[in-house]
Amino acid sequence: MLKREEVQHVAHLARLELTEEEEIQFTEQLTDILAYVEQLKELDTEGVEPTFHVLDMELPTRPDEVEPYPDIEGILANAPDRADMFFKVPRILEGED
């Protein structure tokens, strides 16, 4: 069984703030998921061709088209900090400016 401390550690690494209820819920859910993965490891896949997709098909693609967004100020209004038309975020890498 996954320990609650492990969920807290992963949440910290992902910069997530979890409530006590969420920690308990995620501990249970992740324990179930890991148990299922262990079941999958027991399957005999000898002779089974590796696949990338369940269905043998390619999804259609389209060219990228840049379009101006009509309400830039509305988007930037949600930014905790900004510089002109850009979101301002804390520096995470050391180095020259």
Swiss-Prot record:
This is Aspartyl/glutamyl-tRNA(Asn/Gln) amidotransferase subunit C. One of its GO terms (biological process) is translation. It catalyses: L-glutamyl-tRNA(Gln) + L-glutamine + ATP + H2O = L-glutaminyl-tRNA(Gln) + L-glutamate + ADP + phosphate + H(+); L-aspartyl-tRNA(Asn) + L-glutamine + ATP + H2O = L-asparaginyl-tRNA(Asn) + L-glutamate + ADP + phosphate + 2 H(+). Keywords: ATP-binding, Ligase, Nucleotide-binding, Protein biosynthesis. Heterotrimer of A, B and C subunits. Its EC number is 6.3.5.-. Transmembrane segments: none annotated. Disulfide bonds: none annotated. Belongs to the GatC family.
